[in-house]
Swiss-Prot record:
Name of the gene encoding the protein in the UniProt record: clpP
UniProt-annotated location(s): Cytoplasm
BP terms from Gene Ontology: protein quality control for misfolded or incompletely synthesized proteins
One term under GO cellular component: cytoplasm
HAMAP family cross-referenced by the UniProt entry: ClpP
Function statement: Cleaves peptides in various proteins in a process that requires ATP hydrolysis. Has a chymotrypsin-like activity. Plays a major role in the degradation of misfolded proteins.
Pfam families: CLP_protease
Subunit structure: Fourteen ClpP subunits assemble into 2 heptameric rings which stack back to back to give a disk-like structure with a central cavity, resembling the structure of eukaryotic proteasomes.
Enzyme Commission code(s) on record: 3.4.21.92
Protein name, UniProt field: ATP-dependent Clp protease proteolytic subunit
Similarity-based family: Belongs to the peptidase S14 family.
Catalytic residues, chain numbering: 106, 131
GO molecular function: ATP-dependent peptidase activity; ATPase binding; serine-type endopeptidase activity
Reactions catalysed: Hydrolysis of proteins to small peptides in the presence of ATP and magnesium. alpha-casein is the usual test substrate. In the absence of ATP, only oligopeptides shorter than five residues are hydrolyzed (such as succinyl-Leu-Tyr-|-NHMec, and Leu-Tyr-Leu-|-Tyr-Trp, in which cleavage of the -Tyr-|-Leu- and -Tyr-|-Trp bonds also occurs)
Length: 211
């Protein structure tokens, strides 16, 4: 049976450009990276996190002042992988705008709200979901206690990040994240996860700038 990832990659369109040195072919994602657009799609895990972090650092090296756009469609995933992306977004000098297409759940919602001020967007039919971290561990009783304390520490840290970027109180965030909380784009805007819901790009805007 063929690897589904290999099958998918074989379907990625190629873009051919004419240059002074002849034709040059890019896969569609590499071509959009030239426009400073990063796609964060699928589960957040170590491999995907490494690629996104590398792209952020590359675009900063190219131009430390020019905006980077991140398009998010993710069900979430591993907390530490997501925090690696989050920390890099805050670390680099270029402002990072975020745009939710499809869904931004769990760590996806945290990365969505972590965009630069007034540069966090959602398409009208996107869905956003926030909740507390989950996990499981087997082993000695003492080790289980240590891991339980660690997940509580992670929960507290994630709550603090949401507080920072949404403007909500810690209590409001804690209550909202107690269970899976599903939000429409408008509800996410009212909650402070995004700044604006957009349904059409202005004619003068470039692909890297949603509004």
């Amino acid at each position: 049976m063929r690897d589904p990832v290999e099958t998918y990659m074989n379907l990625v369109p190629m873009v051919v450009e004419q240059t002074n040195r002849g034709e040059r072919a890019y896969d569609i994602f590499s071509r959009l990276l030239k426009e400073r657009i990063i796609f964060l799609t699928g589960p957040v895990e170590d491999g995907m996190s490494t690629l996104v972090v590398a792209q952020l650092l590359f675009l900063e090296a190219e131009n430390p002042k020019k905006e980077i756009s991140m398009y998010i469609n993710s069900p979430g995933g591993v907390v530490t992988s997501g925090l690696a992306i989050y920390d890099t977004m805050q670390f680099i000098r270029p402002p990072v705008s975020t745009l939710c297409t499809g869904q931004a759940a769990s760590m996806g919602s945290l990365l969505l709200c972590a965009g630069a001020k007034d540069m966090r967007f959602s398409l009208p039919n996107a869905r956003i979901m926030v909740h507390q971290p989950s996990g499981g561990f087997q082993g000695q009783a003492t080790d289980i206690m240590l891991h339980a304390q660690e997940i509580l520490n992670l929960k507290k840290r994630l709550n603090e990040i949401y507080v920072k970027h949404t403007g909500q109180t810690y209590k409001a965030i804690e209550d909202a994240l107690e269970r899976d909380k599903f939000l429409t784009a408008d509800m996410a805007r009212d909650f402070g996860l995004v700044d604006k819901v957009i349904d059409k790009r202005p004619e003068e805007a470039s692909p890297a700038k949603p509004v």
